[in-house]
Amino acid sequence: MAAKDVKFSSDARDRLLRGVDTLANAVKVTLGPKGRNVVIDKSFGAPRITKDGVSVAKEIELKDKFENMGAQMLREVASKSADVAGDGTTTATVLAQAIVREGSKAVAAGMNPMDLKRGIDLAVAAVVKDVKTRSRKIATNDEIAQVGTISANGDEEVGKIIARAMDKVGHEGVITVEEAKGLDTELDVVEGMQFDRGYLSPYFVTNAEKMVADLENPYILIHEKKLSGLQPLLPVLEAVVQSGRPLLIIAEDVEGEALATLVVNRLRGGLKVASVKAPGFGDRRKAMLEDIAILTGGQVISEDLGIKLETVTLDMLGTAKTVTITKDNTTIVDGAGVKADIDARCAQIRATIEDTTSDYDREKLQERLAKLSGGVAVIRVGGASEVEVKEKKDRVDDAMHATRAAVEEGIIAGGGVALLHAAKALDALSPANADQKVGIEIVRRALQAPVRQIAENAGVDGAVVAGKLLESSDADFGYNAQTGVYENLVKVGVIDPTKVVRTALQGAASVASLLITTEAMVAEIPEKKPALPAGGGMGDMDF
């Protein structure tokens, strides 16, 4: 076992703070409408230019092990925000840095770190409650477009395209973002279905960089039970190999010999195959498999219907134009099902929705209906160069997730103003002791950080802007960094999804309070490898 280096108390926290600052300073320059770009070197190909906070955070790895720990903890804040709300990564990073900085000062001054943490938790709960009460529901397409525009860093075209996509497939529909071949960004709506089951083995992946399995024009075997033995599968596998097309297997589970054989075939290139678990459970699983069968023009292979796996022929398999499988989701696009059958199935589900008394059942039936009828919207992002397309695609992705979050939990004033004004909710709190009160004050100061950073990125003094906004009693009054005007931000469409703001603060406080309570750090001491000995001379080489 390699020797370890151990750091304690202030020395440990100083190293952590240096790592936090390095990552946060690189990320926070991207915040706001006048945020700058960050150029990321790639080991192959052109450098990547991005304004997406989480993309910058993911690229940062520091040489010093202890500083790197701080940076990685902060990276976790950005990733969590991206996973839960799809946006707000830079805001979360700025908040976390502010809480860690203030918290470290308080700990150095002799405060109790655990009481500080309790104070921070109290304050965050109060702010989240305040933000939720001021949240308003989103109704019109224009509001959806505004959220998209803000999240795409002021790009109106992106906002409008996302609003159109959500209009076409409904709020429950699936929207994916791809790179276009040309200059223009366009919207395609394709009939399709997505369910929340990913590939059973990473060996099925066809695109290793994105960890995605893409199958073009595949056969789809829909099986109700577990597949563990190889023998029953052989006839259908041989038929598919002869056809030269890929195969997707959807079953309750694929394990043992069957899974091993599929993986070996995939790796050796004999058969392009992927398998996923069937979505849902119990009777709902049966119904969803029927949905997939109708959508793809196949049959559910079920013992109840008297169909054995050994007797399956190619005409019993479904087909689709493309199937995309990630670690969490499977999307079937352009299934070969008959439109009349799909419409009949949708009508049947609608009738069941009207009859059902359970809210849970109704919600699940609505999901199935959206998957069958909503289709998949594809936004193809265009640009003059590959670098530009990649940068724009990042922004479209952010904007799409932000609009989803806005539809889910509503909107509030943007530009960091919601958090700034939510600080007033902290006045009503009654902490148990003086150290907890300091924890609350740490959050109060941190809530100003996003507004200050947005202003500073726009070339204005952040402290002056924050001071002016705090004088106002109107919670929607803020600084529009795009135009440089103080105004009602909701009226001019500078809005943020409530979910994004809430997630950013909760994630930031969670990680930051853990960093403050750190008292010791352990890291491996890198081994110094001895230099190789010089090569000996070769005989008979003296000319």
Swiss-Prot record:
Protein name: Chaperonin GroEL 1
GO BP: protein refolding
Its biological purpose: Together with its co-chaperonin GroES, plays an essential role in assisting protein folding. The GroEL-GroES system forms a nano-cage that allows encapsulation of the non-native substrate proteins and provides a physical environment optimized to promote and accelerate protein folding.
EC assignment: 5.6.1.7
Record's GO cellular component terms: cytoplasm
Broad EC category: isomerase
Family classification: Belongs to the chaperonin (HSP60) family.
Extent of the signal sequence: none
Keyword hit for Ubl conjugation: no
Record's subcellular location: Cytoplasm
Subunit and partners: Forms a cylinder of 14 subunits composed of two heptameric rings stacked back-to-back. Interacts with the co-chaperonin GroES.
